[in-house]
Amino acid sequence: MNFEGKLIGKDLKVAIVVSRFNDFITGRLLEGAKDTLIRHDVNEDNIDVAFVPGAFEIPLVAKKLASSGNYDAVITLGCVIRGATSHYDYVCNEVAKGVSKVNDQTNVPVIFGILTTESIEQAVERAGTKAGNKGAEAAVSAIEMANLLKSIKA
């Protein structure tokens, strides 16, 4: 038997956790995610957005939303750009671990849509210019994973 998640968003309820830090990037990621969800038939009323101060706070809020039982998927959006200190490495590692842990603990797909880039230019490219929109890609993954898990439970 093969299991595959369909890209049909009808009747799905999705939460998006988005960092306000680097909002000139995360705002574009959010637009891409919401637009993609709606284009895949997720009702706009079934999309909830939670804003957090920075990427480090994303896993906690994602866990709260995923644990609520109200959502078929949670999308995490943020942007961490390397600076002159090692802070970047700590934040990226902990956020990735945190999001992964939420997946394991809740059995709700929590999609990692957090940019970790070396420069502002790379972030801009991944937020809707040369390299597509990673928020839109995260939305597609959320729909697919939510439907995949539903098909396995059936």
From Swiss-Prot:
MF-aspect GO terms: 6,7-dimethyl-8-ribityllumazine synthase activity
Record's protein name: 6,7-dimethyl-8-ribityllumazine synthase
Superkingdom of the source species: Bacteria
Entry GO CC: cytoplasm; cytosol; riboflavin synthase complex
NCBIfam families: lumazine-synth (TIGR00114), PRK00061.1-4 (NF000812)
Complex formation: Forms an icosahedral capsid composed of 60 subunits, arranged as a dodecamer of pentamers.
The protein's role, per its UniProt record: Catalyzes the formation of 6,7-dimethyl-8-ribityllumazine by condensation of 5-amino-6-(D-ribitylamino)uracil with 3,4-dihydroxy-2-butanone 4-phosphate. This is the penultimate step in the biosynthesis of riboflavin.
Record keywords: Riboflavin biosynthesis, Transferase
Gene that encodes the chain: ribH
Pfam families: DMRL_synthase
EC number, UniProt record: 2.5.1.78
Reaction it catalyzes: (2S)-2-hydroxy-3-oxobutyl phosphate + 5-amino-6-(D-ribitylamino)uracil = 6,7-dimethyl-8-(1-D-ribityl)lumazine + phosphate + 2 H2O + H(+)
One Gene Ontology term from the biological process aspect of the record: riboflavin biosynthetic process
Pathway(s) the chain acts in: Cofactor biosynthesis; riboflavin biosynthesis; riboflavin from 2-hydroxy-3-oxobutyl phosphate and 5-amino-6-(D-ribitylamino)uracil: step 1/2
Catalytic site: 87
Family: Belongs to the DMRL synthase family.
Organism: Staphylococcus aureus (strain NCTC 8325 / PS 47)
Binding site for (2S)-2-hydroxy-3-oxobutyl phosphate: 84-85, 126
Binding site for 5-amino-6-(D-ribitylamino)uracil: 21, 55-57, 79-81, 112
Transferase as UniProt keyword: yes
